[in-house]
């Protein structure tokens, strides 16, 4: 069994819970809010649909120290991703972290150094990476079908205001 802890739901943590039916070897062993009062609606609804009742912990450090999971899902405030990721990697815990990994280049260097000195793996939540439009573009680029790329700009559009759950 791959034991996974979820810390927060401020971005894409639900990509993990929604994949659980296809991942019988994965067990959610604990979860916590990444900041006081953080709504965990999507993740908790997914737990309920799947009949899961993993224990809640007061914070991610208490959780990972108590459970020693294989993987920590980092999905808190952007300003906390760097520290949460480095703490998990220092403990040999694999990290699946939402973007951004860090807010500064110095912070990103710290994350890189933590990953390089750890036995654990670091994976950023590039959730659209294998969507057909991105995957096709990557294949065309790799095959040299569109020539040398000199500039690339892209934007995923979001509606202004609050998004529906």
Give a label for each model feature.
Residues 1-50:
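N-terminal Rossmann-like dinucleotide-binding module
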Residues 5-6, 73-74, 95-98, 122-126:
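Short catalytic-loop micro-motif centered on adjacent basic/acidic residues
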Residues 30, 70-71, 151:
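Short, Asp-centered acidic motifs that coordinate Mg2+ and/or phosphate
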Residues 48-55, 117-121:
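A short helix-to-beta-strand connector/capping loop
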Residues 52-114:
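Beta-loop-alpha module in the N-terminal Rossmann-like domain of NAD(P)-dependent dehydrogenases
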Residues 110-128, 148-152:
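Rossmann-fold dehydrogenase core element
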Residues 128-165:
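Predominantly a Rossmann-like dinucleotide-binding segment in NAD(P)-dependent oxidoreductases
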